[in-house]
Amino acid sequence: MHLPGLIDIPLRFLLLVAGLLVPGSMALRALRLPWSLAASFLISSAMLYMTVLVFTWTGTTISVTNLAIALGVVALAGRVAPMRGLPPPLASSLSCFSGMEAWRPLYLAFWTIVVYRLVTQPLSGPDVSFRWSYLAEQMLKFGSLNFYPPRSGSDFTRYLWAESIPPGIASLYAWAYGCAGSKLALWTSPIVGLQLLSLHELIWRLAQRWGGELAARRAVLLAAACPLLTWAVLIGQETGMTALSVVGIVWCLQNARERNGRSWMILAGICCVAAASTREYGPIFAVVAIVCALVLRLPARHAGCLATVAIPFSLAWPARVWMLTGNPFFSLNVGGIFPTNAVFIEWSESFHQNSAKAFSTAADWFALDRYLVLWALPAVVGVGALLFLVLRKVKETRVATVFIVLTIALWYASVAHTAGGLFYSLRVLSPAYALLAVAAGYGLGFVNWSRNATGLISFAITLLLVEALPKTLVLPENPYRLPFTEWAQAGDRLGHVVRPSATKLENIISALPLGARRRILSDNGGLPRDLADSNIQIVPLWSPEVAFLFDKALKPQEIARRWKESHLSFIVISKASPTRDFIETHAQWHTAFFTVVTVLETDSVLILQAAASPDLGPKT
C-alpha cells in the first residue's frame, strides 16, 4: 500500500525515532532508572547493534522488519517488567536549553547552524559514503553480514575496503534506510542529531553533578564553542557515538553509589557495548571501566553487573572477526602476529607514510598546537582546569581523567594510520573534548571569588562561542580564509567537488569497452556505490582474486595467464592515492607478457589498460 507523501514520510520518521528511543526508554523503566533522552538513545543504539550481532551469528535475515520485531520485543519486555517503586526523577533532558538563561539565544544560534548542516550536508565525512553508509546499504541488500569483513573475491565485490570496523554505526544507518525505504543520506540526520543532543545532555548532567547548574551551563556552552567536537559528530563517522558512550560510562560510574547502583552499572555496561560498536579499539573502554569500578571499590556485585553486560557483547564482534580472518584487527598488522591482507597492508602503509612521520619535527607539534587553539580552545582550557583539579585531588575528576588519558593514547596510536593527516585525526579525540568541557565548566567555579571574576568568565565564554559559530558552520574549512558568501556551503566543499567528479567518472567508465563481464580493477572506494546501477563490477586492488598480480614467486607467464582469465583489462586509479607508484613498484606486469597503456588521465583519475600477451605459451 502506497501512502501519500504527506502521511508516508512522517510515519517513516516516527518509526525511525521510535526505534532509537522507545526500546531504551522501556529498558530504563525495567532497570528502575530515571528517564533520560541520552540513556534511552544509548540503550536503543546498543540494542540495535546487539540485534545485528545476534542475527549475524544465527543467520537471521537482517531486514527492517526483523529489526523492528527485535526492538519491539525489547520494548515490550521492558514495559511488562514489574515496577517496584518509581525512580527519583532527573532534571529534564532539555535542561541544556531551558537552563541557559541569558545565553539561550546564543545557544539556539549554535543549534540553528547544527540543524542547517544536518539538513544540507548530511554524512559530510570524506569516506562515510563508501564505508559506514555503504555497509548499511549492503547489509540490507543482502540481508546479512556474511561478506563482512571481506575475505574472498566475491566478498570484495560487495564491500571494497579490507577492514573490520564493528557495524554499530552501520546498524543505525541500516535502521534509518530501512525505515525510510530510501538510501538518501538525509535520513541519517536524526541519528546524528540525537548523538549531539544526547552528548550535550550528558555533559550537562555530569557537570551539574560535579558543580551545580552554573558549572553545567558553562560546560555545555564550552562544548558548543569547540568546533572540533561538533564536527566529529556531524561528519557521521564513529566519533560522535564514541564521545557519547564514553561520557555515558563516566556518568554512570559516578552514579554507581546512588540508589539502584547495580542498575547504573548495567547501564554503564550498555554504554561500554555502544563504545565497542564504534571501532576496533572499542572494547578497551569496557576493560578500563571495569578497572575503574574496582579501583573505586564499588561493591563486587556492581562490578560484576558491569562486566557481565559489557564483556560478552564488547568482544563478540572481534571474536567473530578473529574466527573468520585469523586476526581480530583485520585491517591492521599487529607486529606480524596475525595474518593480514598483505597487499592492502602494503598499499595502506604507502598511503599513510606521511602520517607515520607525524610528530617527527617541531613543525608537526606546532601544527598540533595551532589546530587545537584554533578549533578546540575550550578543550585546551579544560586541560588547564583538569590539571588544577587533579592537583587539588578533587575526587569527581578521577574517572574522567582516566578516560581522557585513554582517549589521548588511542588518538596518538591512530595518527600513523590516518590517511587524512594530523587535522583529520583530531576527530578521534572527541571523548576527551567532551570531558574536558566538563572539567573546564567545573574548574572555572573555583575562581568565582568576586562578581567581577564571574562577569569576566561569562564574557570570555560568550566571546568563545560567538567566535566558534562561523567555524562550526564551515569546518573543516577555515572561515578566516573564505569569503563570507562561501560559508554556507563550505562545510561540504569536498562533496561539491567529489559528486560532479563521480558522475563524470561514471560516464567515462560506462563508455569503456569492458566486455561481457563488465569488470574493472580499482582503488577507488566510492566506485562500487557510484556504479551500482551500471552493472559494472569493481574488483579492488587488494582482492585475493588478483593477489597473483603482486606475487613475486609466480612466473611472469603464469601471472599473464591468470590476468587474462580474470576478464580484467582496465584499471581506474585515484591520483590522490599512492596507487600509481604502488603498482609501478609492486605489480608483476613489467614483462614481455604484458602491454600496459594509459587510456585517460584527468586531474583526479588515471585509467590504464593492461593486456596479457595473446601468445602465452604453455603453463609453467
Segments (PLM) and residue ranges:
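Membrane-embedded, hydrophobic transmembrane alpha-helices
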Residues: 1-94, 559-560
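Hydrophobic, aromatic-rich transmembrane alpha-helices
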Residues: 22, 196-207, 294, 311, ...
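Membrane-interface helix-loop-helix junctions at transmembrane boundaries of multi-pass membrane enzymes
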Residues: 93-101, 208-216, 259-263, 296-306, ...
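Signature aromatic-anchored transmembrane alpha helix within multi-pass, membrane-resident enzymes
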Residues: 101-107, 213-219, 263-272, 286-290, ...
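Transmembrane alpha-helix segments characteristic
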Residues: 111, 217-225, 270-272, 288, ...
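Transmembrane alpha-helical segments
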Residues: 111-115, 226, 279-283, 443, ...
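Membrane-lumen/periplasm interface segments of specific transmembrane helices
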Residues: 121, 295, 302-381, 471
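Short periplasmic/luminal acceptor-recognition loop of GT-C membrane glycosyltransferases, typified by
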Residues: 496-543, 569-576
